[in-house]
Every structure is written in C-alpha cells, then in structure tokens.
C-alpha cells in the first residue's frame, strides 16, 4: 500500500517493439474492432493486470477467482503470438485483391475476379488451390490437388472467380485454431485470413488450371496387332471322293518323302487274293498298262476293296498327266465292251467315279511339272515290280 492509503499501481514493462505490423493486426473475435489495453485494479489492491484483446470484455470481473494469474496470462499470450506467426504468410507471398468485397451480411456478396500473380516455382510440387466459398460448402469440402511441375518456371497471370459468401466466419475458424481436426497438413497450402474487409490471400505456389490432368481420365492399354503374322504357305490338295463309295480312304501327309497321295480302287477276286497270282506288267504293256490292269482286275469281280497307297509304302511316284487321263477315259469305254453286261456297267462306273479325284490332284500339282513323267505310262518303276506290293 502507498503512504496515502491508495493501492500501488505498477506499470507493465514495455513490450518488444520488433513485431511486424502483420502480427499486430491479426486478432480473434467477430466484432471486427481492436479494443485498447486497459488496466484493471482488483479488489485486493496488490495485483495489476494488463488486459489485451484475446478475451472479450464480458469475461472479466472484479473477483480474484475468475481472473487469470499474470504468469498464466503471459504464457497464453506467447502461445497465441506463436500461432499467429505460423499462420502469417511472408510479405512476398501475399497479393492483395484489386476489388474489396462488400461488407454487407450473408447473401449480398457477388462474384469477384481476383488476379493472382505467380512467381517462380522453386519446389518440384506445385499446389493448385481453387477455393469456392459458397454458402453450402463447408470447410471440410476444400480440396487441394497437387501436380508435378518439375524444374520449369511458371509465370502466368490467372484470374478465378468465386462466391465469397460466409467467407469471414469460415476462414477465421479455419486459420485461427491450429488444433482443429479440419486443418490440412499440406506444407504448401493456400492459407486464407479474412480481416475486416474480407480479402482473400493466396500463396504463389499456384499452377495453371490447364496443367491439371482430369481425374476421370483412364489409362488405355494398347493391344498389339497379332494379325500381321506372316501366313505360312500351305499347299492344299483336294481329293474328291465319290458319295457312292464310302469305303474310299483319303489322307494328307506333310512329310517330304510322302509327296503324292493317290487313291486306287483295287478290285480282287477271292481266288486271286488267296493265290496271289497276277500277270506282271512289262515294258511293252506300260504304255496302256493302267487300262489293261484295271480291265483284268474287273473281269472276274466278286467284291471291291478300298486300298490307299502312298509313295513311301509302295516306293512309287504315282503321277497322272492330263493326256493319260483322257486316254484312260476313251480306252475304258472301248475295251470293256466284250465283258458281260453286269460287269461292264460296274467297271465303267468305277472309272468315271474315280477320275474327278485324279484330275483334282493334277490341278494342284502344276508347280511340280519337273517330276512328271512322259506319256509312257501311269507308273514310274523305281526299285521293284508293282506286283510284289499288290494285296
């Protein structure tokens, strides 16, 4: 107590004057006014507290129980100043808008075009921050899309529009309290502080909207074209089989040794099949040996058998020319006239049914004319007599 009985008044030591104007101008509260610091003397008379603008005036009273101690109040002020330093942007990153939105209440703010100047992007990751402050959009609905800009320098001037309804309350809540669950953890994010004029501040880490790839775009895998594979040269040999002869067998072999496949209708009687007695063909009979051989076999026909002979099995190259085919047709009708009526009809039918299959083989083997024989006969004897292999 003083000598005159009045309580002692202690003046607070001067604060540090090295604060930036930004730290001094950022505040909390919705009344948009900066109350002056005032001195409050408690009823005890021995405590002097300097009250700043961190708490509304209605929270103070003259009782010691409701008053925060001086040390705790100073600690709280230091914590708040540290939070303000974290949320304060450097001077070079802040671009003031060219238009100040109207200070009317909600629903009266229209669209404003804010030009944003973008400097050199030093970090490889640029943040695209397009924030639409609409009336139905909460703080949780603000998304930040990051893209890789590499080492390129982006110096465009971009304008974007947005409805600034309800921007003052939303931005103050998002930037003033760092411990809220809605605060983003992106290091280079767009921080917005709304002073009394409602201005929006955007950082310089802003990439043009054209560089953002659309999220709905999907990667399309190109399937290689497999139709360009070279086709193999396949030689097709059509063996036409008569419908009246279901027992006739046809085969196609890819072996180089089995070059030619010929189907012969061999008709043997039961007695000749048992005795294995046949007249051999000599060189003189080789000119029309095919016709004579077929005539002798069909003379005493009892039953017919379909036999398939290949070049490897019989060791013969069976080659038919067009001239020999015509000769067989003509001679078959002439030489079978002396036979009985039943056998003549059967022998002529056998020759005429089998000739289409032989003709088709001749047509498909035109490119192998060097292997064809002359008009000397149907068979070219290689090693053995044909009678040794006939069944």
Curated annotation (Swiss-Prot):
InterPro entries: Ca-bd_spermatid. The lineage of its organism: Eukaryota, Metazoa, Chordata, Craniata, Vertebrata. Keywords: Calcium, Cell projection, Cilium, Cytoplasm, Cytoplasmic vesicle, Flagellum, Membrane, Mitochondrion, Mitochondrion inner membrane, Phosphoprotein. Residues 278-287 have a biased composition (Acidic residues). It is found in: Cytoplasm; Mitochondrion inner membrane; Cell projection, Cilium, Flagellum; Cytoplasmic vesicle, Secretory vesicle, Acrosome. Signal peptide: none annotated. It comes from Mus musculus. It comes from the Eukaryota. Residues 90-101 have a biased composition (Low complexity). The keyword Cell cycle does not apply. The gene is Cabs1. GO terms for molecular function: calcium ion binding. Pfam families: CABS1. PANTHER family: CALCIUM-BINDING AND SPERMATID-SPECIFIC PROTEIN 1, TESTIS DEVELOPMENT PROTEIN NYD-SP26. This is Calcium-binding and spermatid-specific protein 1. GO terms for cellular component: acrosomal vesicle; mitochondrial inner membrane; motile cilium; sperm principal piece. Residues 1-23, 90-110, 152-221, 271-299, 330-351 are annotated as: Disordered. Calcium-binding protein. Essential for maintaining the structural integrity of the sperm flagella. Induction: Down-regulated by Busulfan. One of its GO terms (biological process) is spermatogenesis. The keyword Phosphoprotein applies. Detected only in testis. Expressed from stages X to VIII of the seminiferous epithelial cycle. Expressed from step 13 to step 16 of spermatid development (at protein level). The modification Phosphoserine is found at residues 253, 269, 314, 347, 357, 372, 376.
């Amino acid at each position: 107590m003083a000598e005159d009985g009045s309580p002692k008044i202690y003046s607070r030591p001067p604060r540090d004057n090295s604060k930036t104007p930004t730290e001094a101008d950022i505040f909390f509260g919705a009344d948009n006014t900066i109350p002056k610091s005032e001195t409050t003397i408690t009823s005890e008379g021995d405590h002097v507290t300097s009250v700043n603008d961190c708490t509304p005036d209605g929270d103070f009273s003259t009782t010691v129980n409701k008053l925060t101690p001086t040390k705790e109040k100073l600690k709280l002020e230091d914590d708040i100043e540290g939070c303000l330093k974290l949320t304060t942007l450097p001077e070079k990153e802040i671009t003031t808008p060219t238009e100040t939105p109207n200070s009317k209440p909600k629903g009266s703010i229209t669209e404003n075009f804010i030009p944003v100047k973008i400097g050199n992007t030093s970090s490889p990751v640029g943040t695209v921050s397009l924030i639409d402050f609409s009336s139905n959009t909460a703080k949780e609905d603000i998304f930040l899309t990051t893209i890789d800009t590499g080492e390129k320098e982006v110096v465009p001037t971009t304008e974007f529009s947005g409805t600034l309804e309800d921007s003052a309350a939303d931005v103050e809540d998002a930037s003033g309290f760092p411990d809220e669950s809605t605060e983003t953890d992106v290091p280079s994010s767009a921080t917005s502080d709304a002073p009394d004029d409602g201005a929006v501040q955007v950082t310089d880490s802003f990439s043009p909207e054209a560089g953002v790839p659309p999220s709905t775009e999907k990667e399309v895998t190109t399937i290689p074209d497999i139709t360009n594979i070279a086709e193999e040269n396949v030689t097709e040999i059509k063996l036409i089989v008569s419908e009246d002869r279901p027992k006739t067998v046809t085969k196609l072999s890819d072996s180089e040794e089995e070059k030619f496949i010929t189907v012969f209708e061999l008709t043997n009687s039961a007695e000749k099949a048992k005795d294995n007695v046949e007249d051999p063909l000599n060189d003189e009979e080789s000119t029309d040996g095919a016709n004579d051989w077929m005539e002798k076999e069909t003379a005493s026909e009892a039953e017919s058998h379909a036999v398939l002979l290949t070049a490897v099995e019989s060791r013969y190259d069976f080659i038919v020319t067009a001239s020999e085919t015509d000769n067989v047709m003509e001679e078959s009708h002439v030489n079978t006239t002396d036979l009985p009526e039943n056998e003549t009809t059967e022998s002529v039918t056998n020759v005429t049914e089998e000739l289409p299959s032989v003709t088709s083989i001749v047509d498909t083997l035109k490119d192998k004319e060097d292997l064809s024989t002359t008009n000397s006969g149907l068979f070219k004897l290689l090693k053995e007599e044909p009678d040794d292999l006939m069944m």
